[in-house]
């Protein structure tokens, strides 16, 4: 749906948590299902840069989830991304606790979109204390100097009967009871490094989501939802007439829907699966998103696509790889078990998986010269989260100096060779990085 097509606006709410691990993802699925059952066309979204939680939204709602992050895309870009959604109500899953995060908290997302917050509170061992917690979160907005409307509570892991009644009765008039999510083992999502399993790998049981949705007050949530402000008009960039090959499989699954949309707006997009044995299609440029190449090293080592990619890159084909894409473009990738597999061999680095994450933050990069995604001196904002470390050759060339974050070696990001660029940073299309990439084809 284009901005003009959604001129009537899309109401929305933000599900903010009291802390990480409180059950926001499951609560989001329950609310989305309840609203859909009530006749609404639901657009899911995620506050922040995460790729994994949104993968659980689409199987339940049937619509790709939008990523809303003011650091990655700016306020106008975030509002534009929101209004490019497709539905009459948007359910935005928050990240971490409501006020947590120095540059892109859930509270900031809610404030800049002017959306009310439904506070997800773990009610497994409390009743009146749930109300006290919610009241504290409501009052803290003034202390944090952020304009956040905490509208009420969704009680996570709450039983019915006296438990639910006690929570509801304890809430002051300023806080609405929006229902509960019952404690059920089949609502748990298994996790691993980088977070939960992807929705395509470990989808939450659909009957369990239905059971949880039955206890959500969908009408109350729809009644408090409201429409964010619109950004200034934005003229789309012209079609390049070029073809971009995008890797799309379990090893390369971290791509924002907005990124795929921007690529399709300005180029012909062909997808391929290196893991499944697809060769690199005929194309004018390649995008390798992040994902889990470390879980598919054998398949990638045998993939004809990586051999072809190495040869085409050496001939000057523009190639952009982010995080997992960077790893696949390296000389080798070693798992935590010590197994080493050859990769495409385009970038002068050997990558090894670590037991602990090596970087997790929003980042800011400054281009030290003209590169695929930015002109010399330009800055890009992104996000990094990875468990791998790259050992680079002494003559390796970097495209970016790190102003915030860790990058590849603490000071630099963006290994570059030929017309290939590999970064640990993930960027959003509103950063202009993908437009620069397309213009370079």
From Swiss-Prot:
The a and c carboxylates of cobyrinate are activated for nucleophilic attack via formation of a phosphorylated intermediate by ATP. CbiA catalyzes first the amidation of the c-carboxylate, and then that of the a-carboxylate. GO terms for molecular function: ATP binding; cobyrinic acid a,c-diamide synthase activity. Comprises of two domains. The C-terminal domain contains the binding site for glutamine and catalyzes the hydrolysis of this substrate to glutamate and ammonia. The N-terminal domain is anticipated to bind ATP and cobyrinate and catalyzes the ultimate synthesis of the diamide product. The ammonia produced via the glutaminase domain is probably translocated to the adjacent domain via a molecular tunnel, where it reacts with an activated intermediate. The record marks 426 as: Increases nucleophilicity of active site Cys. InterPro entries: CbiA/CobB_synth, Class_I_gatase-like, CobQ/CobB/MinD/ParA_Nub-bd_dom, GATase_3, P-loop_NTPase. Pfam families: CbiA, GATase_3. PROSITE patterns: GATASE_COBBQ. It comes from the Archaea. The active site is at residue 323. It catalyses: cob(II)yrinate + 2 L-glutamine + 2 ATP + 2 H2O = cob(II)yrinate a,c diamide + 2 L-glutamate + 2 ADP + 2 phosphate + 2 H(+). The gene is cbiA. PANTHER family: COBYRINATE A,C-DIAMIDE SYNTHASE. Its EC number is 6.3.5.11. Its cofactor is Mg(2+). This is Cobyrinate a,c-diamide synthase. Residues 243-434 form the GATase cobBQ-type domain.
């Amino acid at each position: 749906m284009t901005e003009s097509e959604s001129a009537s606006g899309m109401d929305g709410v933000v599900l903010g948590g009291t802390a990480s691990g409180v059950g926001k993802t499951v609560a989001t699925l329950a609310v989305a299902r309840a609203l859909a059952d009530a006749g609404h066309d639901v657009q899911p979204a995620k506050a922040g840069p995460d790729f994994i939680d949104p993968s659980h939204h689409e199987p339940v709602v049937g619509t790709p989830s939008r990523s809303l992050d003011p650091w990655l895309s700016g306020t106008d870009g975030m509002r534009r991304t929101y209004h490019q959604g497709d539905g009459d109500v948007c359910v935005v899953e928050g990240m971490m606790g409501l006020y947590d995060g120095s540059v892109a908290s859930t509270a900031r997302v809610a404030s800049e979109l002017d959306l009310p917050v439904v506070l997800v509170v773990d009610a497994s061992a409390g009743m009146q204390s749930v109300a006290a917690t919610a009241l504290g979160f409501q009052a803290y907005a003034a202390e944090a100097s952020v304009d956040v409307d905490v509208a009420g509570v969704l009680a996570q892991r709450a039983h019915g009967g006296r438990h639910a009644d006690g929570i509801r009765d304890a809430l002051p008039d300023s806080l609405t009871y929006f229902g509960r999510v019952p404690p059920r083992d089949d609502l748990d999502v298994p996790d691993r490094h980088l977070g939960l399993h992807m929705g395509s790998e470990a989808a939450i049981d659909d009957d369990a989501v239905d059971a949880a949705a039955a206890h959500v007050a969908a009408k109350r949530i729809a009644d408090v939802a409201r429409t964010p402000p619109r950004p200034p008009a934005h003229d789309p960039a012209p079609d390049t007439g070029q073809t971009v090959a995008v890797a799309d499989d379990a090893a390369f699954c971290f791509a924002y829907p907005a990124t795929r949309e921007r690529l399709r707006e300005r180029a012909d997009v062909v997808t391929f699966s290196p893991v499944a044995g697809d060769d690199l299609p005929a194309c004018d440029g390649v995008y390798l998103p992040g994902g889990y190449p470390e879980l598919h090293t054998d398949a990638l080592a045998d993939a004809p696509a990586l051999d072809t990619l190495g040869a085409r890159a050496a001939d000057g084909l523009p190639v952009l790889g982010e995080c997992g894409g960077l790893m696949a473009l390296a000389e080798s990738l070693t798992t935590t078990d010590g197994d080493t597999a050859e990769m495409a061999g385009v970038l002068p680095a050997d990558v090894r998986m670590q037991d602990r994450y090596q970087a997790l933050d929003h980042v800011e990069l400054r281009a030290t010269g003209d590169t695929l995604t930015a002109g010399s001196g330009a800055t890009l904002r992104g996000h990094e989260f990875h468990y791998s470390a790259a050992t680079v050759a002494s003559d390796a060339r970097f495209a970016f100096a790190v102003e915030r974050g860790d990058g590849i070696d603490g000071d630099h990001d963006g290994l570059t060779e030929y017309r290939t660029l590999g970064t640990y940073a993930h960027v959003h299309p509103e950063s202009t990085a993908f437009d620069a990439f397309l213009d370079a084809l």
